[in-house]
Design a protein with these regions (language model features):
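Aromatic-enriched hydrophobic runs in primary sequence
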Residues: 14-20, 31, 50-53, 89, ...
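A general, composition-driven signal for non-globular sequence regions
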Residues: 1-6, 56-57, 126-128, 168
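Intrinsically disordered, low-complexity polar/acidic regions
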Residues: 41, 45-49, 74-193
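Juxtamembrane membrane-water interface segments immediately C-terminal to a transmembrane helix
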Residues: 31-64, 70-77
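Extreme N-terminal signal-anchor transmembrane helix of membrane signaling/transducer proteins, especially
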Residues: 2-35
Length: 193
């Protein structure tokens, strides 16, 4: 065997070794990418589950608060609810600590369009002489008016808002009214934000 043939054989072995190395490296990288993708997917699913559980716990916390308000209102009787009683009830709660993220709690009065003038007289006689109904979009149907809201200092702009004047609020309010269950609205912009 001459030197020329020996060099040729060596270069073939070197080429084959290089090709095999590249193939094995490629397969290893592909396998590692699959493992990494699977681990990333599993980590994302775990995080999504944890986030969903946290959101569920937060919503349940708000439900407890709303049920507490409902219990107080049912105990007092809807006809006896006034601004001072609602304010005193709200003082028994530490809204920021008990319901983190909530801006406050309110009482929404269902008012037939034909009864609007009488409702306004009653609301103004209840220590709110400037009370007026605010509509985001004019409509002829019944009103769902935020009559009381606490704390007023950071929610005053919502006082008098007819939530039936905006579709997302109206749909959530009707569903809550019909089912007796808490409902979330679709995306909205708070008037007091």
């Amino acid at each position: 065997m001459n030197v020329q043939q020996s060099k040729f054989r060596l270069s073939r072995w070197a080429g084959a070794t290089l090709a095999l190395g590249l193939l094995l490296s490629g397969l290893g990288a592909w396998g590692l990418a699959l493992v990494n993708e699977q681990q990333a997917r599993m980590a994302l699913e775990r995080e999504a589950e944890l986030l969903a559980e946290a959101v569920t716990r937060r919503v349940e916390l708000y439900q407890y608060g709303l049920r507490g308000v409902r219990g107080a209102l049912l105990t007092a009787g809807e006809a006896r609810i006034d601004r001072e009683l609602f304010r005193r009830y709200s003082l028994t709660r530490d809204i920021d600590r008990e319901f983190p993220g909530a801006r406050g709690f309110g009482f929404i009065r269902r008012v037939a369009a034909a009864d609007e003038a009488g409702f306004l007289r009653q609301a103004r006689a209840d220590g709110q002489p400037e009370f007026r109904i605010q509509q985001l979009t004019p409509h002829d149907g019944e009103r769902y008016v935020i009559q009381y809201i606490e704390p007023v200092a950071r929610n005053g702009q919502a006082l008098g808002l007819d939530i039936a004047s905006e579709a997302n609020r109206r749909e959530a309010a009707r569903a809550a009214l019909e089912t007796g269950q808490v409902r979330l609205t679709g995306p909205i912009t708070l008037v007091q934000a």
